[in-house]
């Protein structure tokens, strides 16, 4: 259910400052968004997977906290990443 190494590398290359930038808030938010989108398609098929749904809610919460941090520290990057990922904020 997780992303492949190639998918993660592509996300890091797109949102990171360089190829090894995996810790920046932008990259973490983009990776969480990709995982959340992947899990949403999983739950369309497996409606009773409550344990997995709990993990999804945890990811959403972690992404929300990272977005709040980014908004507090760098509003321009926050606005950019919201637009690039198509989030509703």
From Swiss-Prot:
Coiled-coil ranges per UniProt: none
Keyword rRNA-binding: yes
CDD domains, per the entry: Ribosomal_S15p_S13e (cd00353)
Single GO BP term: translation
InterPro entries membership: Ribosomal_uS15, Ribosomal_uS15_bac-type, uS15_NS1_RNA-bd_sf
GO cellular component: cytosolic small ribosomal subunit
Keywords for this protein: Ribonucleoprotein, Ribosomal protein, RNA-binding, rRNA-binding
Cross-referenced PROSITE patterns: RIBOSOMAL_S15 (PS00362)
GO molecular function, one term: rRNA binding
Functional note: One of the primary rRNA binding proteins, it binds directly to 16S rRNA where it helps nucleate assembly of the platform of the 30S subunit by binding and bridging several RNA helices of the 16S rRNA.
Record note on quaternary structure: Part of the 30S ribosomal subunit. Forms a bridge to the 50S subunit in the 70S ribosome, contacting the 23S rRNA.
HAMAP family, per the entry: Ribosomal_uS15_B
Family according to the record: Belongs to the universal ribosomal protein uS15 family.
Name of this protein: Small ribosomal subunit protein uS15
Native species: Actinobacillus succinogenes (strain ATCC 55618 / DSM 22257 / CCUG 43843 / 130Z)
């Amino acid at each position: 259910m997780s992303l492949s190494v190639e998918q993660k590398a592509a996300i890091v290359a797109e949102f990171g400052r360089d190829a090894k930038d995996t810790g920046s808030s932008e990259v973490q938010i983009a990776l969480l968004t990709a995982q959340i989108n992947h899990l949403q398609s999983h739950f369309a098929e497996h409606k009773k997977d409550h344990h997995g749904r709990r993990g999804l809610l945890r990811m959403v919460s972690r992404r929300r906290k990272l977005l709040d941090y980014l908004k507090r520290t760098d509003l321009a990057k926050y606005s950019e990443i919201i637009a690039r990922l198509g989030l509703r904020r």
